[in-house]
Amino acid sequence: MSARRLARLEWRDYCNRVSKQLEGQKAELEVVGLDLGDHVEARWIPLYGLVYEPEGDIFEIALEGIDHLIAHPTDLLVEETLRGLVTIEVIAADDTHQILRLREPLPLPVPLR
């Protein structure tokens, strides 16, 4: 199992596509950074969705009661297993890692060829 890095041009479409399926899924959000240490910002609460706005270069993770914004993200990584999507990681310009874990893997559609 390894994370796959998405090209920046894919971010908006990917977020739009998976957000429809993610809505209501239980998720945990962990933030890891040199200045912050390692802490869990949200523990197994409903996820509303993911948004990337290229105009402002802002990535948003919307959870119940939390609107987590990441300014100037540099990388978006997704971890997928045979059961589906399990983790989404957003790395900010200051090298802070936002790690979103899904309680249950999200089944993904078979890619068209």
Where would I find each of the regions flagged by the language model?
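Mixed-charge (acidic/basic) macromolecular-recognition segments
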Residues: M1, L29, L112-R113
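N-terminal leader/targeting segments and the immediate start of mature chains
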Residues: S2-E23
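A short, Trp-centered hydrophobic/proline-enriched beta-strand micro-motif
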Residues: E23-V32
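Extended, low-complexity, amphipathic alpha-helical coiled-coil/linker regions that act as scaffolds
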Residues: E30, A62-E64, L100
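Short, flexible beta-strand-to-coil junctions
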Residues: V32-L34, G65-I66, I91-D95
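Short coil-to-beta-strand transition motifs
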Residues: L36-P46
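Amphipathic protein-protein interaction modules
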Residues: P46-T87
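Helix-rich interaction surfaces within compact, conserved domain-sized segments
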Residues: H72-R113
